[in-house]
Amino acid sequence: IQVRMGSTRFPGKIMMKLDDKFTVLDYVIRQLGHSKLLENIIIATTNLEQDDIIVQYAKDNDLAYFRGEVLDVLDRYYQCAKKFSLDVIVRMTSDAPFLDPTVVDEAISKFQETGCDFVSNNIIRTYPIGIDTEVFSMEALEKTWNEAELPSEREHVTPFMKKNKEIFKLYNLENKKKIPIYRLTIDRKEDLEFLRAIADNIKKQPILMKDVYELFSQKPKILELYNDSMNLIEGYNKSLKDDEEFLKKMNKNSKKANFKSFKETIENN
C-alpha cells in the first residue's frame, strides 16, 4: 500500500477518523485483512520526516514497511518489492477506505489463471473509484522501472504497463453489474462527511462494494453529500503537464547534442 502524509489537496487525510475509533488508514488495513489470497500487507512510505508517523503506525500494528522516493513512486515500489523478494505485487492506495477484499481476491485469481503480466479493474473502468486493484509480476515491475521515463509513468506506477500492450499481457477485470461510477476515496476535506456517512450506516466488516450500493438505494439522501465536482484524474493530468515539460527539455537537449556533434564533425574535418 502506498502511504504518505503529504497531499496537495488534503494533507494528513489518511489519519482522519471515519468513526469514533478508526482512521481512513485503519479502514484500508482492516478491509484488506479480509482478503483470502493476500499473503502480506506492506506499507510503502517515503523518506520524509513527516512520514515518521506512518512508520510508527506500521510498527504499532505489526506491519512490514519500506521507506523510499517521494514522487518516483515506481522506484519506491520496485525497491520495496526487491527488499521483500516479492514475485507478485498487488498495488493499493491508502485513500480508499472501502477497498473490497472480494474484488482484490478476484483480481489475484485472474492473475494466477491467465498468466498475464498485469491484471487490473481500471484499464477500462467499470468499478467505482476507490475499489481499484492492480496485480502485476516482479518481471513486469522491473521492466517498467527500467524503461519508464515520463513523470506520469514514474509517479503513477502502472501507466507504462497499460500503454504497452505489445510488451505486457494485460487483463481488464470487468464488473458484471452496470453501476454508476462513484468516487469512494478521500481527496478533499469535503469527502469526509460522505465517507463517514457510509461508515456510520454499515456496521459490519468487511464493507463490500455491494453493501455501499445497497445503502445508496436504501438511503439515497446520503448521495446528497457526494462531491462529484472534482476532476477525478486531476493528479494524473498534472503529471501529464510535467510530461510535456520533460519532453520539451529532452527535445532541447537532443537538439543541443546534435548541434554539438555536427560542430565537432565539421571542426574535425
Regions found by a protein language model. Give the residues of each.
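Conserved donor-nucleotide/metal-binding helix-loop-beta segment in metal-dependent transferases, i.e.
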Residues: 79, 84, 100-126
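Anionic-ligand binding region
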Residues: 131, 139-164
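Conserved nucleotide-sugar donor-binding
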Residues: 86, 133-145, 189-193
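N-terminal nucleotide-binding beta1-loop-alpha1 segment
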Residues: 1-11
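Short aromatic-hydrophobic micro-motifs that form the base-stacking/packing surface
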Residues: 88-92
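Conserved N-terminal catalytic core of the sugar/cofactor nucleotidyltransferase
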Residues: 26-87
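Conserved alpha/beta core of the MobA/IspD/sugar-nucleotide pyrophosphorylase nucleotidyltransferase superfamily
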Residues: 136, 157-269
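Short, well-formed alpha-helical segments that are part of the catalytic scaffolds
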Residues: 10-34
